[in-house]
Amino acid sequence: MPLQKIVLRPGINREGTNYSNEGGYWACDKVRFRSGYPEKIGGWTLYSASEFWGVARSMLPFQCQCGATLTGLGTNLKFYVEFGAAFYDITPLAETNTLGANPFTGDGTTTVAVTDAGRTVGTGDFVTFSGVTGAYAGVLNGEFKVTYISGSTYSITTSSAVAAGATGGSAVSAAYQVSVGGSIYTQGTGWGAGNWSRGAWGSATSVGVGLQLRLWSLDNYGDALIFGPRGGGLYYWDYNAGAGLSTRGELVADMPGANSVPIYQNEILVSDQSRFVITLGSNDFGSTDANPMLVRWSDQENYLEWEPTALTQAGSQILSIGSQLITARQTRQEIVIWSDAAVFAMQYAGPPYVFGFTTLADNTTIAGPNAAIVVNNVAYWMGTDKFYVYNGKVDVLPSTLRSYVFNDFNTAQAWQVTTGAVNQYNEVWWFYCSANSNTIDRYVVFNYVDNIWFSGSMNRFAWVDSGLKQYPIASVYDEATEKGQIYAQEYGFDDFTTSPATPIAAYIDSSDFDIGEGDNFGLVNRIIPDISFEGSTGTSPTVNMTLYPRRFPGADYSAGDETSVVRSHTVPVEQYTEQVFVRVRGRQMRFRVASSGLGVMWQLGMPRIQMRPDGRK
């Protein structure tokens, strides 16, 4: 009886039917393609055991002149700088007030009321008290999260009970951090609604849906960080200044020498070569109204000077296609800017115009501010119904998973989409919310060298490739505790964030293929596997290989004829189990290779099956 070699095209293709994709793969999870063959992806471990408040959707590693490597980290609740696997809270302050005498009122529990007629806070905001005297100074001096608001009074929860009555003394100072943001988009709210337009954040401006989701943008300015929340101010933090890591970010507009600094911004970046600070969606010079289509830049090498004069290169430009500018990324030659309807190029031209702008394409979309990435000087991004690429010109990026992704995509949470790269494997990853999920739970990957796609399930909210870090890093979030952590990705082959480590389940399914010519039923009685376990750390790594037969493309798979093969590997890596005997009957079949053991790494080659004709019925 002849052997039939199973030779399959790399990548996952869901653009047709299962049967029409004969010779390809249909589905996978935690599997990538390397050199054309599927293999299990790497595992992950804790980059740091420390937690931080909120879900981090923005991360930027950068290196100071002193050699220190830091990471700016923006969450929906705070802003941090990571150094040495420790997270330092540099969240800017919105306001500092001196409270009236005995501003705290206890009721014998850990719920304490605070009176401050000069500040309107929001639920979830953070405040730090100092100067508290009396019996509860050790309890009330410190940082707290606001839990309830009623007029000029709000509540906090303390670590121990405070007796009934007023307390605190007459010299209490309350330092309020900038308002917290949402972890997801909530319908019916946004800029100009609720607490978003209060206090130091300025007047209400309507610049589109989805902006309630807290997204920070950030870029390094030498040893310093320039950063800010979307719709908020422009902040500066310098590692070498003052107390260093314990120094909070400072509002640029309040710094000595600041002139006409934007009140609002929706995106911040620093041009690599020309050293301008650039904002999108800010207020123009002489205006306090945010313009969502405005590009504005500072004077060269001067983040404090924003007034356009004959002596500066500060300036601005309104772009005309779209209703709001979404994001921007730098390539070697230019800055690429996305609106919700077009793509533009921004290039330094020198005085008097400073920057020139070109429309690269219109009638385009982008899922959100974190949906674009530049890899090897090529821009890739996820739109609302397709993928795009810019490599000299804008094109739709053909995808064998386009329908699969966008037919199961929660467009209401599109601004949660985040992207990252794994240059080691030539991959661009997008993480997104499936149709029935309000948080990220899926990923789709494009291999730009092999021009193939694959997908799976994983919840990562920000991703930065290795470079300044040994491994790619990604953020995770526990909604119940409102705490986040950073994982190091592509570490081993298991989940090392638990103790002991837990296995990562992985599988890949082929599409249906005919047994012989497909006219007759075939009886498969032997499988010659071709699986490598090179790199496995387990003592007996195994995979399950399962054949699923069926009679016709529209018929169910015959569960009764299903035969699983468990292949052990206890000999040198390049020596394989010679053969496995089975009995599986059908006109067409698919197979699955899956693993769920600890320390298992595998790569699938070209297995073979032996079959004989077995009638037409």
PLM segments and residue spans:
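Acidic Ser/Thr/Pro-rich low-complexity disordered segments
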Residues: 88-94, 136, 161-163, 186, ...
